[in-house]
A protein has these predicted regions:
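Short, conserved catalytic-motif segment at the N-terminal edge
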Residues: 74
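Outer membrane beta-barrel
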Residues: 47-70, 81-214, 218-251, 335-337, ...
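Outer-membrane beta-barrel pore domains
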Residues: 24-34, 71, 79-80, 125-130, ...
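Cleavable N-terminal export/targeting peptides
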Residues: 1-33
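Surface-exposed, low-hydrophobicity segments enriched in Gly/Pro/acidic/Ser residues
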Residues: 23-42, 46-48, 157-160, 226, ...
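Glycine-centered small-residue hotspots that permit tight backbone geometry or close packing
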Residues: 36-37, 60-62, 92, 264-266
């Protein structure tokens, strides 16, 4: 409690001390953390830069859920008893700093999360859209199209991670839970973007393949390669279309974390967990890791369109990989589709549904399937405050008779409120 009080005092002092900078909070080439950031994917690129000195933007978010879920299985493994109540409130602290013309820093700290009730740093990066800090006019024409990102940061694999809940930053997610196979990781690396004038863009990146950074055990983990090719165009005032294909691959890793890197935890607390489970330690409830521990190649295709208030976002994911103990590679597939309708003044209300299915050949030889149906609705009280309600129903099929997931299912209602600024 004393440590938390000291940290809270520090944050208050920081916010108060920087309040003068907070009057104009707009930054160049920046995804807004409020309603304006919805359906923004990569940070926008604008060659008209407004830098007039170092500017510090202090932001953050806080989210609270009420959970009313129940679960069941065959009884081979006893499930923990769960009831209806509130989950731990989560919070983020964001620092975004304009350091020079076209140069910006981002840093996110998780103040409170399911897995880590204590504060810890998620990661951060430098984003470079202009090279005048080297020499005025240096590569000026090229930098109208190029963006460079370097840091210990969230990899840009696929488009689904732009819509996922990141601890308390849940403004961009129209639902409460993320995908069953939640493709997300933070690694030290660099990404180079090229954006043309016709809507086409591409990205190539390299990372060190490590979630937990260390200089010990050299040679156990090789580099990870990332790539993305896409088209994103506002065809008319009413219609926007986007289509991307992405790849993430590493052929040698001490541990692949692509589907287990989110250490903040899932939104469905303690579902399908045994009687010894604790919310902070068994924090991936409701998610699925295909178990490609040491070698993986993943491809994701994401179509998106928005026509007036109607929007669709899809995910088609094909993954191959294995653990060192396996002699041959296995395959996993994930498909998801979201249909959202936004309505009312400034589209302040929405209703939507998502279907998500995962199939995988497990190391045991079992062919398993997990299906999830979500039905949700939301209302923006202001551009910084969103309330959501969701019905979720998840079914497990094909699991071994001794598995806790054998004939497993969970379903019920979730309520969530988020403040983000």
């Amino acid at each position: 409690m004393k440590t938390f009080a000291q940290f809270s005092l520090y944050v208050f002092a920081l916010l108060f001390g920087l309040s003068a900078w907070g009057q104009n909070r707009n930054l160049d080439n920046f995804r807004s953390p409020d309603k304006d950031g919805i359906n923004v994917f990569e940070a926008p690129k604008d060659s008209m830069l407004t830098f007039d000195g170092v500017k510090v933007r202090v932001g953050g978010s806080s989210t609270l859920q009420f959970q009313g879920l129940n679960h069941e299985n065959s009884g081979a493994v006893e499930l923990i008893e769960i009831g209806d109540n509130f989950n731990l409130a989560t919070a983020n602290l964001d620092l975004d700093v304009a350091l020079a013309k076209g140069v910006r820093m981002h840093l996110r700290t998780y103040l409170s999360s399911r897995h880590h009730p204590e504060p810890y740093v998620k990661g951060g990066y430098f984003q470079i859209d202009n090279l005048d800090f080297i020499s005025p006019g240096f590569m000026e024409e090229a930098m109208k199209h190029l963006t460079i990102k370097v840091g210990h940061m969230e990899n840009n694999y696929g488009d689904a991670h732009f819509r996922r809940s990141d601890n308390s930053q849940t403004m961009y997610n129209p639902f409460v839970g993320n995908l069953i196979m939640d493709g997300f990781t933070t690694e030290v690396g660099a990404e180079l973007y090229y954006r043309g004038n016709t809507g086409f863009f591409t990205m190539f990146g390299l990372s060190n393949g490590k979630l937990n950074q260390a200089v010990s055990s050299p040679g156990e983990t090789g580099a990870s390669i990332l790539a993305k090719l896409g088209y994103d165009k506002q065809i008319s005032d009413d219609f926007r279309f986007r289509l991307t294909g992405s790849m993430y691959s590493t052929g040698n890793a001490a541990r692949v974390y692509l589907y287990t890197a989110d250490r903040t935890g899932s939104r469905y607390y303690l579902v399908m967990e045994d009687t010894d489970a604790r919310a902070s330690s068994q924090f991936r409830s409701g998610r699925y890791d295909p178990g490609f521990r040491n070698e993986i190649t993943a491809f994701m295709i994401n179509p998106f369109f928005k026509y007036r208030g109607l929007e669709f976002f899809g995910t088609i994911e094909a993954v191959k990989g294995k653990a060192d103990a396996e002699t041959s590679k296995r395959s996993a597939t994930q498909i998801a589709g979201e249909l959202i309708y936004r309505f009312g003044n400034n589209e302040n209300f929405y209703i939507g549904t998502r279907y998500n299915t995962v199939s995988n050949e497990e190391a045991s030889g079992d062919d398993i399937t997990i299906d999830r149906f979500q039905l949700g609705a939301g209302a923006f009280l202001t551009k910084n405050i969103l309330t959501k309600i969701e019905y979720v129903n998840q079914q497990y099929d094909g699991f071994d008779a001794a598995s806790i997931f054998n004939e497993g299912a969970f379903k019920g209602v979730m309520l969530e409120a988020v403040i983000s600024f």
